[in-house]
Design a protein with these regions (language model features):
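A cross-family phosphate/adenosyl-ligand binding-site feature
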Residues: 3-6, 17-82, 88
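Short, glycine-rich nucleotide/cofactor-binding loops
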Residues: 5-12, 105-106
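Short beta-strand segments
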Residues: 6, 33-35, 94-97, 128-129
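Conserved active-site and cofactor/substrate-binding residues in soluble primary-metabolism enzymes
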Residues: 11-14, 18, 71-75, 87, ...
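A short, flexible beta-alpha/helix-coil linker loop
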Residues: 98-101, 132-133
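Glycine/threonine-rich flexible loop motifs
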Residues: 100-109
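Hydrophobic/aromatic ligand-binding patch that stacks against planar heteroaromatic rings
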Residues: 114-118
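Glycine-rich, Lys/Arg-enriched anion-binding loops that position phosphate/diphosphate groups
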Residues: 119-145
């Protein structure tokens, strides 16, 4: 299974990196396209009238990791329309977000908005969030995914 991973906390965020390691251990093919820094509460915003910059920051053989200068939604769009145009994923997962996304929080969540792009491309997608991100809890959450 080919999975696109993204988030709103940035490419180097512990939640995303832990989820990447967990899914890689289950022999999933992964592509990671995430913001180059923190973009929490970006909601469903997109970058317009401004250039987006992308940088390959792959560290693990066989897993492509790309940092994008835009929002979480920009990351999914860049992945689907450029990087994975001829190699569509089977699933999009956004997270693990550092902080709950409950109630009206989902309206402002970049994590949730990135996952909401999935159906636009005909793909299943979901977001994962947690509060109290310790290494142990993050690993447990990644294992549940």
């Amino acid at each position: 299974m080919h999975i696109l991973l993204t988030n709103d906390d940035g490419l180097k965020a512990p939640g995303l990196q832990t989820l990447k390691r967990e899914l890689a251990s289950h022999d999933c093919r992964l592509t990671v396209v995430a913001p180059n820094g923190q973009r929490s509460a970006a909601s469903h915003s997109m970058t317009i009238n401004k250039a987006l910059y992308c940088r390959d920051e792959s560290t693990v053989p066989g897993i492509r990791e790309i940092a994008v200068s835009g929002t979480p939604v920009d990351c999914v769009k860049m992945a689907m329309e450029y990087f994975l145009k001829d190699d569509k994923p089977d699933l999009i997962i956004s997270g693990i977000n550092d902080g709950y996304n409950l109630g009206s929080d989902v309206l402002y969540s970049g994590t949730v908005s990135a996952a909401m792009e999935g159906p636009y491309y005909g793909l299943p997608a979901f977001a994962v969030s947690m509060l109290g991100m310790t290494d142990e809890r993050c690993v447990q959450t990644a294992h549940l995914v």
